[in-house]
């Protein structure tokens, strides 16, 4: 970590804790800043704030009092989840207090080069794939960012010989100014988080900040399957490396079932360790990064063939009596489940789906359901999901929860079948988040395996 004097004796307000705010507070204190932390969670329910107070850091909890900004702070570090229309943020901007992001703070002190990965879908899987391949190739890749390891914490142990492989959300990128990765990946761009950004255009603008400071000596990897990429590519100074599953490009591409990089065959799509058309895209982006990083083709192929996925993201859980289980609880919308289904033989597949009812019909999913062996349907959206199953002429059973659904699926399954949890719905009707939903699937698998 570089020791910089930019923040020495500067009064800095950390607005919002969570993992990133806590890490930023500790880093800034180490750099000599006079830190105050403000978090909306009450102090007696806030272990992170309690720990910071024990370290001598000033904490104010329970609300975001606007008058706190009268203390003449010289910087504010905003938690990514706090929107810019928050009264504290609006007041800080009106007072012309510079806003820093936690990832930019990490950039300022990083001795290690940064590979940044953003996009609407596939960020976590691609970030993990890239780190795995780089490490397999003898490099030292450190996961950081939106993947659960705050960048401002990881950067403190990173040295010049390391590489920070950083997952970045639109929330983290919207406020950056100086941030400059050496390689950036945008997996895809879909209309998401519009409640935060206001419009798809503003959402794209936030994602596009990943390349704002890049030069022609840096590399920007874009999904050439999307028309928007061609438009964006004309506006960057970085060297663009495209990837595509639909056409041959001057980068990474799929052709006749083989993944290539600039005419060099790397691996067959059927040899990838994770199924699904989206994972071919993730693998192509990974191949581009790996080749730019000097990793040998055989190491790339070996690593991608053994990659088992990320927890809750089309995760291959294991087998019981030659019946394979996949946990794709992260698939909270139709598109994600469509991509998951693309990697399987429907005639041998039992799909567990359903969840929070957002009023959407599932007509777009019907073509992907055709030929399914069976569906197990659950959750508030069950009636809508049943209508889709009927249109696809797929038989189904109902379950009260994921555990019961998994048990029913296992009773119906035969040797060689696959059981896939890919709900196409959010979890909040029955579970606090998709992780808890997926964990119930994993726990049920463990019980079934123990009884087998």
UniProtKB/Swiss-Prot annotation:
ATP binds at residues 119-125. It is an enzyme of class 6 (ligase). The keyword Nucleotide-binding applies. GO terms for biological process: cell division; cell wall organization; peptidoglycan biosynthetic process; regulation of cell shape. Its EC number is 6.3.2.9. Gene3D superfamilies: Mur ligase, C-terminal domain (3.90.190.20), Mur-like, catalytic domain (3.40.1190.10), NAD(P)-binding Rossmann-like Domain (3.40.50.720). Its main location: cytoplasm. Keywords: ATP-binding, Cell cycle, Cell division, Cell shape, Cell wall biogenesis/degradation, Cytoplasm, Ligase, Nucleotide-binding, Peptidoglycan synthesis. Cell wall formation. Catalyzes the addition of glutamate to the nucleotide precursor UDP-N-acetylmuramoyl-L-alanine (UMA). GO terms for cellular component: cytoplasm. It catalyses: UDP-N-acetyl-alpha-D-muramoyl-L-alanine + D-glutamate + ATP = UDP-N-acetyl-alpha-D-muramoyl-L-alanyl-D-glutamate + ADP + phosphate + H(+). It comes from Streptococcus pyogenes serotype M5 (strain Manfredo). The keyword Ribonucleoprotein does not apply. Belongs to the MurCDEF family. This is UDP-N-acetylmuramoylalanine--D-glutamate ligase. It is found in: Cytoplasm. Pathway: Cell wall biogenesis; peptidoglycan biosynthesis. One of its GO terms (molecular function) is UDP-N-acetylmuramoylalanine-D-glutamate ligase activity.
């Amino acid at each position: 970590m570089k020791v910089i004097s930019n923040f020495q004796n500067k009064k800095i307000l950390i607005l919002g804790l969570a993992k990133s705010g806590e890490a930023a507070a500790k880093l800034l204190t180490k750099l000599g800043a006079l830190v105050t932390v403000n978090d909306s969670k009450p102090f007696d329910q806030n272990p992170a704030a309690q720990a910071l107070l024990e370290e001598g850091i000033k904490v104010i909890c329970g609300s975001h009092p606007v008058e706190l900004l009268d203390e003449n702070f010289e910087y504010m570090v905003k938690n990514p989840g706090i929107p810019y229309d928050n009264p504290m943020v609006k007041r800080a901007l009106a007072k012309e207090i510079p806003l820093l992001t936690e990832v930019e703070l990490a950039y300022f002190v990083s001795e290690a080069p940064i590979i940044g990965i953003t996009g609407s879908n596939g960020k976590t899987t691609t970030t993990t794939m890239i780190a795995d391949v780089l490490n397999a190739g003898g490099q030292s890749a450190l996961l950081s960012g939106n993947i659960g390891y705050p960048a401002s914490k990881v950067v403190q142990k990173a040295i010049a010989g390391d590489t920070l492989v950083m997952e970045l959300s639109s929330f983290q990128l919207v406020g950056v100014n100086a941030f400059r990765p050496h390689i950036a990946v945008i997996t895809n761009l879909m209309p998401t988080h519009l409640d935060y950004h206001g419009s798809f255009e503003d959402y794209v603008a936030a994602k596009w900040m990943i390349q704002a400071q890049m030069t022609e000596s840096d590399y920007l990897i874009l999904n050439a399957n999307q028309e928007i990429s061609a438009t964006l590519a004309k506006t960057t100074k970085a060297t663009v490396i495209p990837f595509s599953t639909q056409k041959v490009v001057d980068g990474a591409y799929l052709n006749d079932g083989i993944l290539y990089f600039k005419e060099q065959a790397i691996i067959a799509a059927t040899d990838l360790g994770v199924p699904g058309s989206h994972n071919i895209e993730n693998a192509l982006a990974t191949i581009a990064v790996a080749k730019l990083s000097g990793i040998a083709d055989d190491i790339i192929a070996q690593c991608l063939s053994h990659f088992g996925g990320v927890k809750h993201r089309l995760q291959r859980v294991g087998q019981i009596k030659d019946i394979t289980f996949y946990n794709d609880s992260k698939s909270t919308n139709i598109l994600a489940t469509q991509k998951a289904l693309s990697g399987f033989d429907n005639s041998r597949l039992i799909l567990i789906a359903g969840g929070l009812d957002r009023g959407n019909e599932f007509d777009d999913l019907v073509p992907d359901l055709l030929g399914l062996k069976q569906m197990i349907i659950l959750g508030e959206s069950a009636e809508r999901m049943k209508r889709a199953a009927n249109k696809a002429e797929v038989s189904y059973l109902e379950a009260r929860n994921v555990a019961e659904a998994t048990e029913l699926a296992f009773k119906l399954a035969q040797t060689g079948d696959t059981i896939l949890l890919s709900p196409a719905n959010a979890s909040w009707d029955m579970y606090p988040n998709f992780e808890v939903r997926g964990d119930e699937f994993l726990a049920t698998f463990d019980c079934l395996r123990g009884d087998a």
